[in-house]
Amino acid sequence: MEERYIRNLGALTEEECAVLRGKTVFVAGCGGLGGYLIEMLLRLGVGEIRAADGDVFEASNLNRQLLSSPSTLGSGKAAAAAARAREINPEVRFVAVSDFVTEKNAAELVKGCDAVLDALDNIAARRLLAVACAEAGVPLIHGAICGWTAQAAVVMPGDDLIGRIYPEGSRLSSKASLSFTPPFCAAMQTALCTRILTGRPVETGRLYMADLLDMELESLF
């Protein structure tokens, strides 16, 4: 085993680490959640990572987005993710798509993936992504943040969990996001994703919610 993955052992088996190197994961969004998800997957040793985002960095991203810095303001988020991938783990095949997830491209983006990570910032795109994953038979690991709170869930094909989390007419209540909420949420998502990729049991149809202000964790549905 390569030395860079040695500290995975004990938590993961050598066989599981080898399995991860043969997996492909799509990260939808390269901003607050996406940057941390990509970082964790790169260091974990997933073989191929695809990432899509049509946005560019602006000053309001600096408080929480791992890939944002004064030097990246105005540059594309997907391109910044690709540069980070080359720096952190050049052995990982990284495919960057400088476009938003849309009805036209969602099916192609998730095609051939073993898991999809939701790092989107709007409900409409989440619904599109959930439909594409269901049609492709790919597990979706949902994640969302707001202020002090973070949530994550595994959505398996055939389960309309996204529809239950965001019923028709739902709106995002706030754009507030603190520096520590995205990495906490990304850690939950990556842990769930790792269990799926390695064949470990994972509970589906549950929404895990963390309140970091009151230090409470609950499971809904």
What does each model-identified segment do?
Residues 27-29, 52:
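Conserved N-terminal Rossmann-fold NAD(P)-binding element of oxidoreductases
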Residues 41:
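Aromatic pocket-lining residues of Rossmann-like dinucleotide-binding sites
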Residues 2, 108-115, 119-221:
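Glycine-rich phosphate/adenylate-binding loop
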Residues 74-115, 120-126:
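A structured beta-alpha segment of the ubiquitous adenosine-cofactor-binding alpha/beta core
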Residues 33-34:
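Hydrophobic/small residue at the entry helix of a nucleotide-binding pocket
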Residues 1-26, 144, 164-165:
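N-terminal charged helix/coil linker that caps or initiates catalytic domains
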